[in-house]
Amino acid sequence: MESILSEERKCYICGSTRWLERHHIYGGANRPKSEKYGLVVYLCHWCHNEPPNGVHFNKERMRWLREEGQRAFQKRYPDLDFLAIFRHNYL
């Protein structure tokens, strides 16, 4: 599924259009759910996988992105219970 957070093919964090990678906001066991509900964004390689600021190395950025994901989910799917599906409240 396409992203419910952004229709643009650019880094969700910095806006770059170079070296983009698709990031599932909720990984691990929740990765298929991220895909199902459109909780994916494009990130440039530096904002995705490079220390110290890539989301996989920076807890604050990861937390912010998960908050953004939950807000987008609740707006798009008002009849679904985010907590019941993802087992965590990020807000």
Give each language-model segment a name.
Residues M1-E21, W46:
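Short cysteine-rich loop/turn motifs with clustered Cys
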Residues E67-L91:
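Short flanking/linker segments adjacent to small metal-binding domains or redox-active Cys/His motifs
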Residues Y26-V40:
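Short linker/helix segments within small regulatory modules
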Residues R18-E21, L39-L43, G69:
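Amphipathic alpha-helical interface surfaces
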Residues L20-G28, C44-P51:
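Histidine-centered catalytic micro-motifs
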Residues V40-W64:
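Short Cys/His-centered divalent metal-binding micro-motifs
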